[in-house]
Amino acid sequence: MERITVTLGERSYPITIAAGLFNDPASFLPLKAGDQAMLVTNETLAPLYLDKIRHLLEQAGVNVDSVILPDGEQYKSLAVLETVFTALLQKPHGRDTTLLALGGGVVGDLTGFAAASYQRGVRFIQIPTTLLSQVDSSVGGKTAVNHPLGKNMIGAFYQPASVVVDLDCLNTLPQRELASGLAEVIKYGIILDGEFFSWLEDNMDALLNLDGKALAYCIRRCCELKAEVVAADERETGLRALLNLGHTFGHAIEAEMGYGNWLHGEAVAAGMVMAARTSERLGQFKQEETQRIITLLERAGLPVTGPREMSSHAYLPHMMRDKKVLAGEMRLVLPLAIGKSEVRGGVPHDVVLGAIADCQQA
């Protein structure tokens, strides 16, 4: 069992990583006998895990209700958020309830925002079931829903009480979802840890084959890196923005193509190549390092070009609505070397458009 702490003073919390955590009620601390909880999941995961976790917690004396959401990025919306509030109010659940987010990034982000908002804030626990949510979205307290004009535009910073990562969940994860998560894994190597990137080059086959030892190390390392960044910059005023490598381009793809048509990790993968090409055009990133990124993404089964039907100019309106925009100026996360990156403003639009075009034609 691996345990990492996200250090935020009185709001610090553990990330527990192991196989078989869904068999032990202690995994879900600080829940205890007599507590009330609302388990939020989706229609894909409910048949796999809902009854098991509910029975486990009820055996431990926790009173558990549940709400089952439709599955897909297009349901990360205010309308679906309202169904969670309705379920909480119908019982009713008070301020002493705990929300349990059992699912991937959509369930985790939406449930976290519900917890931040319901009666001005209730406790919640992240139970991520996808690789992407285990290494990224469940850690750090970013919660949100989408708006038709932009991804994650309505949300709050709100930290969970704990994060429970059961490695067994990955055994039921579709290959496309596994690859999507690997995009965020590769991102950590590019922006923060060149040695980890090299490890990924050596161990990608093991990860794709769900080797338990490789997965445990990979998830632990990603969570360590994320925890360090969040502890230093919880509200994304500086360092934490580096975690958005590829996301400014990627969010444009998701919004333009319709949420759910490109998985988040797929869009981020293409976006990271666009960021690398931008950095190349600025003379601060080597072409051979871009090729290393492309090769690793392709080995993971990820796209390295944008959608053919999306022109370069279609990206800019979405990118100008990005949350990193300041005083009307686009700011991009750009790699400087494998393991080192920066946030840079003032990149000429023609450079950005050229980099996107490079990726469309690759």
Swiss-Prot record:
Q: Which organism is it from?
A: Enterobacter sp. (strain 638)
The job of this chain, per UniProt, is described as: Catalyzes the conversion of 3-deoxy-D-arabino-heptulosonate 7-phosphate (DAHP) to dehydroquinate (DHQ).
Is NAD given among the entry's keywords?
A: yes
According to its UniProt record, which cofactors does this protein need? Co(2+); Zn(2+); NAD(+)
For this UniProt entry, what's an example GO CC term? cytoplasm
Sorted alphabetically, which Pfam families does this protein's record hold? DHQ_synthase (PF01761), DHQS_C (PF24621)
Q: Which residues bind NAD(+)?
A: 71-76, 105-109, 129-130, 142, 151, 169-172
Keyword list (alphabetical) reads: Amino-acid biosynthesis, Aromatic amino acid biosynthesis, Cobalt, Cytoplasm, Lyase, Metal-binding, NAD, Nucleotide-binding, Zinc
Pathway listed: Metabolic intermediate biosynthesis; chorismate biosynthesis; chorismate from D-erythrose 4-phosphate and phosphoenolpyruvate: step 2/7
Source domain of life: Bacteria
Example GO BP? amino acid biosynthetic process
| An example molecular function term from Gene Ontology annotations | nucleotide binding
What PANTHER family is this protein classified in? 3-DEHYDROQUINATE SYNTHASE, 3-DEHYDROQUINATE SYNTHASE, CHLOROPLASTIC
So where does Zn(2+) get bound?
A: 184, 247, 264
* Compartments, record wording: Cytoplasm
- Name it: 3-dehydroquinate synthase
Listed NCBIfam families: aroB
Give the protein family.
Answer: Belongs to the sugar phosphate cyclases superfamily. Dehydroquinate synthase family.
